């Protein structure tokens, strides 16, 4: 299993949102490039970077900063506001390893398919964020500001038929809460779509959570708030 540190960017700083709410922001004193270099030195193979300003505005705002983070030598999967072929190509040409496509996959499937065909499916990670208010996980869009009527399962089925292999799934209710991930959701995801390389995010607290997710068949975990805790040894998580 791949352990991927997450860095959320807002106005050039490292931040975390609580349950995706922009009015509940925790800002950290460490600078993004320093944070990326820190994880690279510890042996991380990949970073997950989200441009929150881009996610909110609909156009990536911090590509220059993300490219600077990439110069630390660590591969980056990045998203937040990629809403056109031009933006996708700009990010890809800048050397970003995998582009993270979120809301666009729900609001404009035709354009998303064009991007997938242009960039290639293996270079795309679909970020599908859900609210499980009923038994059916429904997708949220636009930086979690709006709900859609699309279910996770129907959207995954659609894009799997178009070659997508990597999907990052977050239960919004778990994100930033440090109460544990939604294991039932990920178990269903792997059972329904075993050919997808699932990335889990939201609520992961400790090594036991990571081990449990691995036993369910999850391919990668995204670690955010957990890595800002003083008692966490990231090198041990990589073992």
From Swiss-Prot:
EC number(s) given by UniProt: 5.3.1.16
Alphabetically ordered keywords of this record: Amino-acid biosynthesis, Cytoplasm, Histidine biosynthesis, Isomerase
Gene Ontology molecular function: 1-(5-phosphoribosyl)-5-[(5-phosphoribosylamino)methylideneamino]imidazole-4-carboxamide isomerase activity
Listed GO biological process terms: L-histidine biosynthetic process; L-tryptophan biosynthetic process
Subcellular location as annotated: Cytoplasm
InterPro entries linked: Aldolase_TIM (IPR013785), His_biosynth (IPR006062), Isoase_HisA-like (IPR044524), Isoase_HisA-like_bact (IPR023016), RibuloseP-bd_barrel (IPR011060)
Entry's family note: Belongs to the HisA/HisF family.
Protein name from the UniProt record: 1-(5-phosphoribosyl)-5-[(5-phosphoribosylamino)methylideneamino] imidazole-4-carboxamide isomerase
């Amino acid at each position: 299993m791949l352990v991927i540190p997450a860095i959320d960017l807002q106005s050039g700083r490292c931040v975390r949102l609580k349950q995706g709410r922009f009015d509940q922001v925790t800002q950290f004193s460490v600078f993004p490039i320093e944070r990326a270099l820190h994880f690279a030195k510890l042996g991380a193979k990949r970073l997950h970077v989200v441009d929150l300003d881009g996610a909110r505005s609909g156009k990536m705002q911090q590509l220059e900063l993300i490219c600077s983070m990439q110069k630390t030598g660590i591969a980056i999967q990045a998203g937040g506001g990629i809403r056109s072929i031009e933006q996708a190509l700009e990010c890809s040409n800048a050397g970003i390893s995998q582009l993270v496509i979120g809301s666009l996959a729900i609001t404009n499937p035709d354009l998303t398919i064009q991007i997938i065909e242009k960039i290639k499916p293996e270079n795309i990670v679909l970020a599908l964020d859900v609210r499980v208010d009923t038994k059916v996980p429904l997708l949220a869009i636009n930086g979690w500001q709006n709900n859609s009527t699309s279910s996770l399962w129907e959207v995954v089925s659609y894009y799997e038929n178009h070659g997508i292999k990597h999907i990052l799934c977050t239960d919004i209710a778990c994100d930033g809460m440090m109460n544990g991930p939604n294991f039932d959701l990920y178990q269903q995801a792997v059972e329904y779509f075993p050919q997808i390389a699932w990335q889990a995010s939201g609520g992961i607290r400790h090594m036991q959570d990571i081990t449990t997710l691995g036993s369910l068949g999850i391919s990668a975990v995204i670690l955010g708030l957990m890595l800002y805790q003083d008692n966490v040894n990231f090198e041990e998580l990589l073992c």
